[in-house]
Amino acid sequence: MSSAPRRPASGADSLHTPEPESLSPGTPGFPEQEEEDELRTLGVERFEEILQEAGSRGGEEPGRSYGEEDFEYHRQSSHHIHHPLSTHLPPDARRRKTPQGPGRKPRRRPGASPTGETPTIEEGEEDEDEVGEAEGFRAPPQQPSPASSPSAVQFFLQEDEGTDRKAERTSPSPPTQTPHQEAAPRASKGAQTGTLVEEMVAVASGTAGGDDGGAAGRPLTKAQPGHRSYNLQERRRIGSMTGVEQALLPRVPTDESEAQTLATADLDLMKSHRFEDVPGVRRHLVRKNAKGSTQAAREGREPGPTPRARPRAPHKPHEVFVELNELQLDKNQEPQWRETARWIKFEEDVEEETERWGKPHVASLSFRSLLELRRTLAHGAVLLDLDQQTLPGVAHQVVEQMVISDQIKAEDRANVLRALLLKHSHPSDEKEFSFPRNISAGSLGSLLGHHHAQGTESDPHVTEPLIGGVPETRLEVDRERELPPPAPPAGITRSKSKHELKLLEKIPENAEATVVLVGCVEFLSRPTMAFVRLREAVELDAVLEVPVPVRFLFLLLGPSSANMDYHEIGRSISTLMSDKQFHEAAYLADERDDLLTAINAFLDCSVVLPPSEVQGEELLRSVAHFQRQMLKKREEQGRLLPPGAGLEPKSAQDKALLQMVEVAGAAEDDPLRRTGRPFGGLIRDVRRRYPHYLSDFRDALDPQCLAAVIFIYFAALSPAITFGGLLGEKTQDLIGVSELIMSTALQGVIFCLLGAQPLLVIGFSGPLLVFEEAFFSFCKSNQLEYLVGRVWIGFWLVLLALLMVALEGSFLVRFVSRFTQEIFAFLISLIFIYETFYKLIKIFQEHPLHGCSVSNDSEADSSSNNMTWAATTLAPDNSSASGQERPRGQPNTALLSLVLMAGTFFIAFFLRKFKNSRFFPGRIRRVIGDFGVPIAILIMVLVDYSIEDTYTQKLSVPSGFSVTAPDKRGWVINPLGEKTPFPVWMMVASLLPAVLVFILIFMETQITTLIISKKERMLQKGSGFHLDLLLIVAMGGICALFGLPWLAAATVRSVTHANALTVMSKAVAPGDKPKIQEVKEQRVTGLLVALLVGLSMVIGDLLRQIPLAVLFGIFLYMGVTSLNGIQFYERLHLLLMPPKHHPDVTYVKKVRTMRMHLFTALQLLCLALLWAVMSTAASLAFPFILILTVPLRMVVLTRIFTEREMKCLDANEAEPVFDECEGVDEYNEMPMPV
């Protein structure tokens, strides 16, 4: 026999009787890595494969040389008095052992390096040890002793082994032949344990839980193996957890067979090495070893992950919902987790007195709490990608990690676990009268008690009463893989409450929750913390206020004596998790340092306020500005991240290429880009928009479109009636309500069927009304036929439109800046306001006020006047009909007209303000505000109808589809003249007014299209500037043949139409602005609105009841509301305001006050010039004067003001308005006339 000693390879080897010290040369060598991957998931099925293989493996390598390390290891392992591990185990915790097979190939230990430094454990070498230990189970066993009893020693299992191990216990094992094993004498020290070895082998013949375990003929080869496959993480246990007297399931540092050959000191050393985790003293580093893959390639196998390897957890960041729970006492003085705050984007706190949610606000944190949080994260437990599916499983792992990291004592494990599993309550629970949402830990345990794997009895659960003074009680948490989730009994399910549904609407669909648990407990001597990121987000029952899957958990417990504010630290981590950059870093973190780096980045962009008393909110204005600068700096730093963190190009070549691609994409999407070919822009519009033609009708199948039809109908009908009545007054009923309604209907239908942007609403506007009045005055003063002149203007309009579209002249709209738009809008608003009071003064002149008199003559005159009024009001046609003189000098007419005008204005204006108020729910406010003008008209008509003895002038509307004045005109206008031949020179000279009309239509239509097509509105189907302009102008030219008015894109009505079809996202965090989800870009709503406006001719009897004074009130309303959003109007206010009261806006902060006032004075001068032109006989040329402001701004103003000042004073800062801000609506979005 060879004298070379041999160290025991595994516990399976040492369970045998002494064997020969030398092996035959013919024994095949042990392949080191052949079964490495499979043995990582070593289970019952795998053992059956191994045990059924023929032949034995092992043997020493030929020529194996032994060094001093091997001799020292042999001396330490076999030349001492050893006590079998079974002496430390309770009688009921024994289990059958597996005999030893032939020796395996000796291998050099990865011992200390020659330099004396701590060696590094190679994972491949760890795996080879495990493979070698498993090979020992293939040895021929010894016959068992029938006198032994079955044992129940269990070992720590991986989660995947639980099911396999249970299946082994419940299935019988087929018998196999027991080959003969040769025995050999051993050394004297080894002989002392011979009896114990035989006893252990005899004990190993039993089965775990079977009655026939002691049968003499029971083969040993099917015994439950004592070996298990483990990973390095499962060694992380302290030595106190391995004491058999303190654990229900004994924990041993190694296999029993190997343990019996080791002394007590060796076992203690092994326990300390494998289980304890002493802070500051770490064991060998574990690094990846490529030996396994190279060995697999050498043997012809495909290298790949082992079956035990799990895929990397998905780290894609999601939206976040954070809930802060604090440990508090309920009304029964029982501890519970009480929700005190939540974060969707901003912080919402629960008011203590009223138990309701406060207003969302930006969280303000103390600097010390952030530093304390960073310190606790640096020293606390951090568990990333924890693979648990239930709260008890998570709590168990957290508590074990706290014990391992020496944050809590072992005896505090039960108390901390009990605290983690306390009941969770929320402010909304008390408002619900259905089944309680929270299930206590005890009731949950009673529900789960009927679903144990054994079916009869179960191990202790965390839900059973925990006695803090009994440290030997082991707490078992059922793993989800071992137990199916218990089905809830009938009656425990409930529907979501209104509060939950409302809150879920504000949370994004893919959001994942963060649960923050903080509180004071007196059984701890120092604070303990744990930060957990689950491998997959799971819904934890009765934890959150709403059913949102949980991905992160943060726990902070400690005594009240600690110098630490747990509430503020909880708010700090909650605010950090609600921060976009930090929670993205938390998703992508691989270790603790990544979290600490993210906290430092958060601190770099935080604002610290000095501890000084703030007397007013205006002192904090600079904070918001400073914060915006910090955020801008943070975004710029984010662009400089290394590759992989973003897609930002780094090289100059990549940046240039990206810039070229962006420019090319922007140019391709720009509808105003010139192609250089005749009608090139028109062709591009058709190719861009018409492919979506069928979808324009399919997208209208939505209830929101039906609501928009009703709303836009009244929004379009009210201006048609108002402008129609005023146009009839200006043109002596040559063009009135009926013509305007018919023109709106016909042109609206055609445009919705053929237009490129069907969201535009075609209608009459104030600038066109001003031009119609000026042209009518011009024709009347020159004895020309007004309607015939309009026909020739229409002819020239068509030619001008064709020429403009052929030359792709729509790009000229870019040169119409805010400077010109505001002058134009301000002029039209002044005209509206002026005309309103001018008409009212005229009524007072026609119907003067009378003093009180008691004379009979006065009474007689009054009676005659009343009789005259009565005959007038009772006549079939109203007083304004053609062929009748309006009555004059009627009593109380002027006062009633004033009341009707003022009442209409104030009701419409108040309802507009009411839309953005805080009364009633938002939906009701929006309905009332959107229908403010029709409601005001209806109320004032009822007031006028109820006053029967006072005359008021009514709207002139014919019966049926007839022109307003049938005795003056018909439906078709003769271009050569109706009553007298039209002069030829005027046919040619009509080109000049045609140019002026074209300027007005061009500006209104193209600027409105620009506003609708802003990128903030997220339109997908595109617009068509050239096609829309050609359609609108061509339809106006054709309609002039029928005596119908010209129309243009109405700015306010178009923006209102687009807003009505905009779908806002419901998942809006409290305090955040809503975002556009989609826009229903379709043609049906505009088509139906146009048809309904045309059918409004059938309600002529109702329209004839509308007093003109009511229309004057609407006129005043449009003039006043049009001033909102005009920066010129706001800067006029600043002329009378001290600089210290100026608002905090760009053109005030970036431009000196005198320079700003100079710019305002220049705009005021241009406005005065336009007003002077309007007041003279040359009023027809006001569009030409208006267009001259464009070169004035481009040539003159650029010489007076710097480029920076012009950008501040003439920038278009208006953004689409979708949310409900007080005093803000569609009128604030555009500096264009109504």
Swiss-Prot record:
Residues with PTM N6-methyllysine: 271
Extracellular side stretches: 844-893
Compositional bias annotation for Basic residues: 76-85, 94-110
Location within or outside the cell: Apical cell membrane; Basolateral cell membrane
Transmembrane segments: 705-728, 734-771, 791-813, 823-843, 894-911, 927-947, 981-1003, 1029-1050, 1084-1129, 1156-1192
GO-annotated molecular function: chloride transmembrane transporter activity; chloride:bicarbonate antiporter activity; enzyme binding
Tissue: Expressed in the parotid and submandibular glands (at protein level). Expressed in the gastric mucosa (at protein level). Expressed in the choroid plexus epithelium (at protein level). Expressed in the liver and gallbladder.
Compositional bias segments (type: Gly residues): 207-216
InterPro entries, A to Z: Anion_exchange, Anion_exchange_2, Anion_exchange_CS, Band3_cytoplasmic_dom, HCO3_transpt-like_TM_dom, HCO3_transpt_euk, PTrfase/Anion_transptr
Positions with biased composition (Acidic residues): 120-133
Family annotation (PROSITE patterns): ANION_EXCHANGER_1, ANION_EXCHANGER_2
Membrane topology (UniProt): Multi-pass membrane protein
Activity regulation details: Inhibited by 4,4'-diisothiocyanatostilbene-2,2'-disulfonic acid (DIDS).
Modified residues (Phosphothreonine): 254
Cytoplasmic side: 1-704, 912-926
GO biological process: amelogenesis; bicarbonate transport; chloride transport; digestive tract development; negative regulation of CD8-positive, alpha-beta T cell differentiation; negative regulation of CD8-positive, alpha-beta T cell proliferation; osteoclast differentiation; positive regulation of enamel mineralization
Residues carrying lipid (S-palmitoyl cysteine): 1166
Cellular compartments per GO CC: apical plasma membrane; basolateral plasma membrane; membrane; plasma membrane
Compositionally biased residues, Basic and acidic residues: 39-49, 58-75
Keywords: Anion exchange, Antiport, Cell membrane, Glycoprotein, Ion transport, Lipoprotein, Membrane, Methylation, Palmitate, Phosphoprotein, Transmembrane, Transmembrane helix, Transport
Glycosylation sites: 856, 866, 878
Family from the record: Belongs to the anion exchanger (TC 2.A.31) family.
Name used for this protein in its record: Anion exchange protein 2
Native species: Rattus norvegicus
Classification of source organism: Eukaryota, Metazoa, Chordata, Craniata, Vertebrata
